[in-house]
Amino acid sequence: RQMCIRDRFQRGRPAASLLCTKEPCIAVNTESENRSTFWYGDFDEPSCKFRTWQIPCSSHDSLYNLVTYYRLGYGTESLHRLGRELEWEGYQGEALDTPYYFVFHAAFEALYHWVREGIPAPHAPKIETEMTYAATDPTGVQAANRTDSLGNALGGIRYPAADCPTSVCQSYTVREDGGLQQMFGTEYPFPPEKLKAVYGDLGHYRALAEKSADNAVAHGWILADDRDELVRIAVETAARRGL
């Protein structure tokens, strides 16, 4: 059903929306999915109202949505009933914990206004990719996200974790035994020396984070109500990592 608006070779014309209905749809993808979804682009046709929102410096699961959320008490009964514990299983770097969930807040609000009021959702650039025709990482996907000079994905919805990163992010985790947590990402924090070389001091970093957040709000990718919290998290993360 998805093939009506996606095409790995970026050809073709849609006949319907994601679920072959006339209702609007916003496909929000992290770096765990964007290389294998191959969305053609956005559409505003009567039979296909569609947006692709792609978030760099993210993974399908993160420390917040797979570990912290449950430790706060949400859903713990279900976990206990299943006899499961949710943990990051990496042995290098840190569990990915970029606050990309704020983008989902904006996506839900945009979708509501699109469905209820006919106000089209904002457009967003796709993460820049290139076909490799061979596996580029342990997940086996034959496409790669192009990266900037700091090692993170180019394009996509920009927010402080992507515009002024304090780590290199990857969308999967390698266990010590060589196995994978394919949908739970890893961050490799920059050493304090690199943070200082790139950003100077925490005051300058805050200014960059505020500029990034303001740009995201202006484009409709972040809610205005979430702006200050997004900046706070970015600055506190930079300080914790030694800036």
Model-predicted regions and their roles:
Residues N34-F38:
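Conserved alpha/beta-hydrolase "acid-adjacent" motif
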Residues R1-I5:
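Short, small-residue-biased leader/transition segments that mark boundaries at the very start
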Residues F9-G12, L18-E23, V28-E31, G41-R51, ...:
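Alpha/beta-hydrolase-fold serine-hydrolase catalytic core, especially in secreted/extracellular enzymes
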